[in-house]
Amino acid sequence: MKELKYDVLIIGGGFAGSSAAYQLSRRGLKILLVDSKPWNRIGDKPCGDAVSKAHFDKLGMPYPKGEELENKINGIKLYSPDMQTVWTVNGEGFELNAPLYNQRVLKEAQDRGVEIWDLTTAMKPIFEDGYVKGAVLFNRRTNEELTVYSKVVVEATGYSRSFRSKLPPELPITEDLDDKDADVAYREVLLTKEDIEDHDYLRIFIDQETSPGGYWWYFPKGKNKVNVGLGIQGGMGYPSIHEYYKKYLDKYAPDVDKSKLLVKGGALVPTRRPLYTMAWNGIIVIGDSGFTVNPVHGGGKGSAMISGYCAAKAILSAFETGDFSASGLWDMNICYVNEYGAKQASLDIFRRFLQKLSNDDINYGMKKKIIKEEDLLEASEKGDLHLSVADKAMRVISGLGRPSLLFKLKAVAESMKKIKELYLNYPRSPSSLGSWRREVDNVLTEFNKSLS
């Protein structure tokens, strides 16, 4: 079998993998990125396709341009189940043609020295002496099996986790996903019968009957094209997502022309805190495989780019020291936790709270402003839910009709603060991971009890 050597092997060329490749390019490293899809389908993952502009600015990633940019977004409108209350949260973003943008980032990385193979599958890890040292690949273009050795493997295989799942199960990096900590999602892109009103605002509809544990979305891709879909919580025994889509599409997108269907597809999405560790001996895990998706709104492209940025940062540091052990790559965890993971863990608490609410609770809470737009904005941006003394008093008055909701909100705020502080005090070395993880699990267990 043919053997090749690289400094870095990136498995998966979606938003996470392509970002890591882009950030690592022109740094003097020999890098190979492989993806199992043909080039023109890399990055083609069914989702809402919306990304905050702030992510591009912070990470130095190129803005989408031309056909990659389908719509500029100025905010989100959030609808209560009874449609009587609408909150508006302002913020700039892009509605993307995600595959086109993804492929351009890959092409730029390629132009800067990264080698890219499409139609190539990582068959199994090379695992020796407790380290991931590469992978056995099968290239369907050349119809050959190859052994590729590398100092670091970046696992960016998405929800399938198809590479790290083949590692010895005792490694912390192989952590599995509870079905209830994931959403099943489905979406279609259709043309509309007439121009969309306020086409620069995304619409999100919360309803525990039409999308239990998730939400419906209506994301304009211009004046007469829309990405419409829904997510529902996994592991709950709910009916097929296609049943919900067919039954309720007219309620949320009455303006679409069903004969003008452009794209359709479904996906599974992790909606929890990130992996307890995203780095181990010779390996870093990013993107959906590292559970980097926002637990509340299910968006994963921005946080995937953050994880790619952190992977590049940790890898460059490891090459400076020559240490590719878990300790040498530990900066991956520190970087991601500080950039996004602490907030994400806090939002995992908020997600659990929202999924337990009834439609009546949500209608009442939004109408009476027991939960406010400012709460949502602060939670989404920082992972915080701060309630001042005066604010608490006003909420008590508003919440007299539903004291249990107010009590739960207090428990939510406290648990969000606890878990965020734990993540901001993430262990500085692998030796402390086990005790820290037990503390996190205790917070989650206690919070789940408070919701019962």
Curated annotation (Swiss-Prot):
One GO MF term: oxidoreductase activity, acting on the CH-CH group of donors, NAD or NADP as acceptor
Pathway note: Membrane lipid metabolism; glycerophospholipid metabolism
Cofactor notes: Binds 1 FAD per subunit.
pH dependence: Optimum pH is 5.5 for the reduction of GGPP to the hexahydro-product H(6)GGPP.
InterPro entries in the record: DGGGPL_red, FAD-dep_OxRdtase, FAD/NAD-bd_sf, Geranylgeranyl_Rdtase_fam, Geranylgeranyl_reductase, GGR_cat
Substitution effect: Y215 to F/L: Moderate decrease in catalytic activity
Keyword line: Disulfide bond, FAD, Flavoprotein, Lipid biosynthesis, Lipid metabolism, Oxidoreductase, Phospholipid biosynthesis, Phospholipid metabolism
Binding site residues for FAD: F15, A16, D35, S36, K45, P46, C47, G48, D49, A50, A122, D288, G300, K301
SUPFAM superfamilies, alphabetized: FAD/NAD(P)-binding domain
Residue runs in coiled coils: none
Effect in UniProt of substituting W217L: Large decrease in catalytic activity
Impact reported for F219L: Slight decrease in catalytic activity
GO biological process: glycerophospholipid metabolic process; phospholipid biosynthetic process
Temperature characteristics of this protein: Optimum temperature is 55 degrees Celsius for the reduction of GGPP to the hexahydro-product H(6)GGPP.
Gene3D superfamilies, per database record: FAD/NAD(P)-binding domain (3.50.50.60)
NCBIfam families recorded: DGGGPL_reductase (NF041080), GG-red-SF (TIGR02032)
PANTHER family reported in the protein's UniProt record: DIGERANYLGERANYLGLYCEROPHOSPHOLIPID REDUCTASE (PTHR42685:SF18), GERANYLGERANYL DIPHOSPHATE REDUCTASE (PTHR42685)
Family to which the UniProt record says this protein belongs: Belongs to the geranylgeranyl reductase family.
Assembly and binders: Monomer.
Protein purpose: Is involved in the reduction of 2,3-digeranylgeranylglycerophospholipids (unsaturated archaeols) into 2,3-diphytanylglycerophospholipids (saturated archaeols) in the biosynthesis of archaeal membrane lipids. Catalyzes the formation of archaetidic acid (2,3-di-O-phytanyl-sn-glyceryl phosphate) from 2,3-di-O-geranylgeranylglyceryl phosphate (DGGGP) via the hydrogenation of each double bond of the isoprenoid chains. Is not active with NADPH or NADH as an electron donor; the physiological reducing agent is unknown.
Name of this protein: Digeranylgeranylglycerophospholipid reductase
Organism in which the protein naturally occurs: Sulfolobus acidocaldarius (strain ATCC 33909 / DSM 639 / JCM 8929 / NBRC 15157 / NCIMB 11770)
